[in-house]
Design a protein with these regions (language model features):
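Short, well-ordered alpha-helix to beta-strand connector turns
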Residues: 21, 61, 121-123
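Active-site neighborhood of phospho(di)ester-bond hydrolases with catalytic His/Asp-centered motifs
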Residues: 1, 22-29, 49-52, 103-107, ...
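Active-site metal-binding motif and surrounding structural segment of the metallo-beta-lactamase
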Residues: 3-50
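Core dinuclear metal-dependent hydrolase active-site scaffold
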Residues: 1-10, 66-124, 221-237
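Active-site environment of divalent metal-dependent phosphoester hydrolases
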Residues: 30-34, 55-57, 87-88, 111-113, ...
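Glycine/small-residue-rich loop that forms an oxyanion/phosphate-binding "nest" at active or ligand-binding sites
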Residues: 35-89
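A short, charged, Gly/Pro-tolerant segment at domain boundaries
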Residues: 208-222
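Cap/insert and terminal regions of metallo-dependent hydrolase folds
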Residues: 113-212
């Protein structure tokens, strides 16, 4: 998690003022992901989109909106995806504006098949690629933590992420951003190569594959005439 000051500085680095933000979408309420939320929401009075269950952990919020399955923020249409993590009511999102769309899914042990159709053939995918299974099993993490990460309420491995992405991407897909890589149980090379091998096996191709880094903003991705700011600050969402 990062402080509100840090998030403000990183936004300003790419020419965005906090006052320009009109919504914060929460994926889940683990403390290390929402560290700066209280100060950020209080200082800038930005509406935070959460579930009623999330509110029990975020009861300090003053300006919040309960998530619906689908809703609009300005000219953006949001589709909410239920994820599976060891935090109550975790969520992912599809953000649509005109003909452009972004999928954002991290911190989940799997993706329910009922969402496959709506997740298919989007322009940009920000997808968790948390760990290499062999590195995790041979690493220093205790057994119970390894089991938690590998469980249906844990995190997507490189293999899982590549499997889902190879089935989701289509002719409209312009970019994949691999996110939430473990610093202890993964490498950028392993995550990238696992995805490339899976795409090659399925005879699919994506021109732009980006590895999101912790504590560093990700490059801007241009979709036709619109710019979407894609930042992966360490566990900031």
């Amino acid at each position: 998690g990062n402080s509100a000051k840090y998030v403000k500085e990183k936004l300003e680095d790419i020419g965005v003022e906090p006052e320009e933000i009109n919504a914060v979408l929460i994926t889940h309420t683990h403390v290390d992901h929402v560290k700066g939320l209280k100060v950020f929401e209080n200082k800038y009075n930005i509406p935070v989109y959460i579930t009623d269950v999330m509110l029990k952990s975020l009861d300090y919020l003053n300006n919040y909106v309960f998530l619906e399955n689908e809703f609009d923020i300005g000219d953006m249409h949001i589709i909410v995806i239920k994820t599976s993590h060891d935090a109550p009511d975790s969520r992912g999102y599809i953000i649509i504006s005109g003909d452009d769309s972004i999928v954002y899914i991290t911190d989940t042990g799997y993706i329910n098949k009922k969402y496959f159709d709506v997740l298919s053939n989007r322009n940009v995918y920000v997808m968790e690629s948390n760990h290499d299974i062999e590195m995790l099993n041979n690493g220093s993490y205790p057994f119970n933590l390894r089991q938690r990460i590998l469980s249906d309420k844990g995190h997507l491995s490189n293999y899982d992420s590549a499997k889902y992405l190879s089935s989701f991407i289509g002719n409209n897909t312009k970019c994949i951003i691999l996110a939430h890589l473990s610093e202890d149980n993964n490498t950028e090379e392993l995550a990238y190569n696992t995805l490339i091998e899976r795409l090659n096996d399925s005879d699919t191709h994506v021109d732009n594959i980006i590895i999101a880094k912790q504590n560093k903003e990700t490059e801007l991705v241009k979709l036709w005439l619109r710019l979407f700011v894609l930042e992966k600050l360490k566990k900031s969402i």
